Regions:
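Catalytic cores of large soluble enzymes that bind and process phosphate-bearing ligands
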Residues: 2, 6, 151, 210
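Phosphate/anion-contacting hairpin/loop surfaces
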Residues: 65-182, 187-194, 202, 209
Length: 287
């Protein structure tokens, strides 16, 4: 599933290429995404000009004069851009697949600048929701989210004040979108390794110095990933069809039985399952 850095990369790419463009028409090949696309979807977006593109957590938001379009990529959703006159650009690829199957191209947005924005989703867990309001505060999907991890609000004091009496391990807490929004399995694994914290450590047992480390390293790993173009494990591509490269810098994620990357550590990377998710940690330096 694309996480915060991947959605941020897509947002920046889209902003450069399609912001201020007008949607000429919308073609829908398959309405059956996570939430069925309504019959009024194309009509509501035709002739609307994109005034801004923003991100909150793992959601992408297209802003129009009096409307909003909320997008979530689910497990395998991708947005691609092609030039209307050059269909060859369309032949991009998945990370582990040389062919992007056009049967999974579900929505085509034809734009006034000669570009076509395509939504491709193999598993169809992603969705688009249209709102007749320009106010983000009216979007129910966003109202219950915790602060953005890269924001000033997500700091040591916030962390300390919001873990009191919580009977959760640190891995599950960081995955809770009501506590902090946008984090997913990859970056939580990496941030906990960088902080020398075992993923099963109970929140109420965290010392202030450990909280400081976790807060700092969450921000660090996210910024680093954004600078590297995001992570491409299986499905993520940016809008140009290019893979991110942060996966080359993973310390623990997907590294089961590898030696710890810390030179001074003789531990091995172990894999356990926490709340149904694969979790990776060093057996020695994350105790």
């Amino acid at each position: 599933m694309p996480e915060l850095p991947e959605i941020e990369i897509v947002k920046r790419s889209l902003y450069k290429m399609i912001n201020k463009a007008k949607i000429i028409n919308v073609k829908i090949n398959n309405k059956n995404l996570r939430y069925k696309i309504p019959n009024t979807f194309s009509k509501n977006l035709t002739n609307e000009r994109i005034l801004n593109i923003s991100r909150k957590s793992k959601y992408l938001i297209f802003h129009f004069k009096k409307k909003l379009l909320l997008a979530h990529f689910g497990m395998s959703g991708k947005l691609f851009i092609i030039r209307n006159r050059d269909k060859k650009i369309f032949k991009t690829s998945f990370y582990y697949n040389l062919n992007l199957d056009p049967k999974h191209n579900h929505i085509f947005f034809k734009l006034s600048n000669g570009l076509i924005l395509i939504y491709n989703d193999v598993r169809r867990f992603g969705f688009f929701k249209f709102y007749n309001t320009p106010e983000i505060s009216r979007i129910n999907f966003l109202n219950k989210l915790g602060p953005e991890p890269l924001s000033r609000k997500f700091n040591v004091e916030f962390f300390k004040n919001n873990i009191k009496k919580r009977k959760k391990n640190i891995k599950n807490l960081l995955m809770d979108q009501k506590f902090v929004s946008g984090l997913g399995n990859i970056y939580v694994n990496e941030a906990l390794f960088m902080s020398n914290i075992h993923p099963l450590k109970e929140c109420y047992n965290l010392e202030k110095n450990q909280i400081r480390k976790i807060t700092f390293n969450i921000k660090k790993v996210l910024r680093t990933s954004i600078s590297k173009g995001g992570s491409s494990i299986k499905d993520f591509k940016n809008t140009h069809g290019k893979s991110g490269e942060f996966q080359q810098f993973f310390h623990v994620y997907g590294k089961e039985n590898n030696n710890c990357s810390r030179i001074s550590c003789k531990g091995k990377i172990k894999k356990i399952v926490i709340s149904g998710r694969s979790t990776f940690y060093c057996s020695k330096c994350q105790n």
